[in-house]
Each structure stands twice: as structure tokens, then as C-alpha cells.
Amino acid sequence: MKIAVIMGSNSDYTTMIETCKLLDEFEIPYDKKVVSAHRTPDLLVEFSKNARRNGYSLIIAAAGGAAHLPGMVASMTTLPV
């Protein structure tokens, strides 16, 4: 199982760091990525539609301010978000 931890910007990592620490503690492989629903929508679409093909089983998504990122990702993949 491989998890994608995605956030809207680098500054959101301060929010996601506890998630990453927990995944490390349980030795669950994951990748961290910045995928912005507002600044890089094409990247968001490509990431979401290809996440399963790229080996992800689950996507953890968060962004500061607005919660558009998780909803946008969930609308384009059948993986749990």
C-alpha cells in the first residue's frame, strides 16, 4: 500500500507533518506532493486521474483556507480521499 499526501502549498506542510509522522511510525510508504486546486489545476486533474495507475491506494489531501483540494481530487478518482 502506498499513500499520497497532497497539500495545496508548501506552507500546508506544517499542518500535514503530524500525518507524515504517523505514517512513518507505522512504516507506511507515502509520497508528499504539492498539488494546488487553484494554481495548478491541470496538475490536479492529471494526478487525480492517474493516482491508482501510479500505485496509490489512498489519498490524504488538505489545504489551508479553503477545502477545495480534497473535494476536487475525490471527484476525479475512485480512491478513498
Roles of regions detected by a PLM:
Residues Y30-R52:
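N-terminal beta-loop-helix "entrance" segment that forms/cooperates
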Residues M1-A37:
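Glycine-rich phosphate/diphosphate-binding loop of Rossmann-like nucleotide-binding domains
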Residues F47-V81:
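Glycine-rich phosphate-binding loop
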Residues D12-I17, P41-D42, A63-M72:
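Short glycine/serine/threonine-rich phosphate/pyrophosphate-binding segments
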